[in-house]
Amino acid sequence: MNILISNANDKPIYEQIYTQIRNQILSGALPPGQALPSIRALAKDLRVSVITTKRAYEELEKAGYLYTVPAKGSYVAEKNTQLV
């Protein structure tokens, strides 16, 4: 998964993460059932706060793009044509 963060961007960092993951899901780059990096691993890779990545994942889950399995991780949800 490739995510680029820009401090020059007007959007908050969590929103940049949200948008890029959502676009990868919609394009099929992240297929349904695909495991996403853990919140901590993604935060470390992007050099951002765990709270920032947690918020992005929560927003993606609220929007129906992800689902979380406790103690297992976050996964891409099945495509819902009503979301697109």
What are the roles of these predicted feature ranges?
Residues N9-Q16, S49-E59, K72-G73:
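Short, mixed-charge, low-aromatic patches
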Residues L36-Y67:
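N-terminal helix-turn-helix
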Residues N2, S27, G33, R47-V48, ...:
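Generic secondary-structure boundary/loop-capping signal
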Residues A63-V84:
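HTH-adjacent hinge/linker in prokaryotic transcriptional regulators
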Residues M1-A35, A41:
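Extreme N-terminal segment that seeds HTH/winged-HTH DNA-binding domains in transcriptional regulators
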Residues T19, T52-T53, T68, T81:
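Residue-identity detector for threonine
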